[in-house]
Amino acid sequence: MSSSQKKAGGKAGKPTKRSQNYAALRKAQLPKPPALKVPVAKPTNTILPQTGCVWQSLGTPLSLSSFNGLGVRFLYSFLKDFTGPRILEEDLIYRMVFSITPSHAGTFCLTDDVTTEDGRAVAHGNPMQEFPHGAFHANEKFGFELVFTAPTHAGMQNQNFKHSYAVALCLDFDAQPEGSKNPSYRFNEVWVERKAFPRAGPLRSLITVGLLDEADDL
């Protein structure tokens, strides 16, 4: 056995500094796994939260398309979970803020009428509780919002009270470019604002209930 073989054999299993540097360089060049998209703690491109309010991001981006060119009608729901004892539901104010990106800039309008045929607000709860004070607002800065007040239950005390609220909104198309494909909407962010309330549990994740495409579905 030559002296070079003995020398190499004597260092078997012990990495050299050169091999360590090479391994580190090779590891750095390996493709990294995709980063997880975690919702941020406060709105980024929406309006800023007001004092005394809690903002929460609900869900991931959602894309909707119109198949008949009449518009898109869709329904969102979220669960309000109160876990603390002796919590009053009255005077809770919710605001849903949608940040949207249309497929064709300037080709959509927000309907002024978001009520049913008999004049009731389309925001309702379970079991089908009405929100007569619901107000719909369009804002060019971030999209549109629906503001409503939860119904007052005359001093009712909720213990482990769980309530699911659904909000139905309607978008109509306006001045769609000739020859364009079916327009679509991408909802970048959905935020819910509620008044800070003692011992109130967090709002659960956003649930997509359904997509309505017929004009008389709502």
Curated annotation (Swiss-Prot):
Provide the coiled-coil residue spans. Answer: none
- Main localization of the protein described in the UniProt heading: virion
Keyword check for Acetylation: yes
> In the record, which positions carry N-acetylserine?
2
> Which Pfam families does the UniProt record give?
Ilar_coat
Cell membrane keyword on record: no
Q: Which UniProt keywords apply?
A: Acetylation, Capsid protein, Ribonucleoprotein, RNA-binding, T=3 icosahedral capsid protein, Viral nucleoprotein, Virion
Query: What are the subcellular locations of this protein?
Result: Virion
An example of a GO molecular function for this protein is: RNA binding
**Which GO CC annotations does the UniProt entry carry?**
ribonucleoprotein complex; T=3 icosahedral viral capsid; viral nucleocapsid
Region listing for Disordered, in residue ranges: 1-25
Similarity comment: family membership: Belongs to the alphamovirus/ilarvirus capsid protein family.
Stated role: Capsid protein. Binds to the to the 3' end of the nonpolyadenylated viral RNA and is involved in viral RNA translation initiation. Probably binds RNA and plays a role in packaging.
Record's protein name: Capsid protein
| Lineage of source species | Viruses, Riboviria, Orthornavirae, Kitrinoviricota, Alsuviricetes
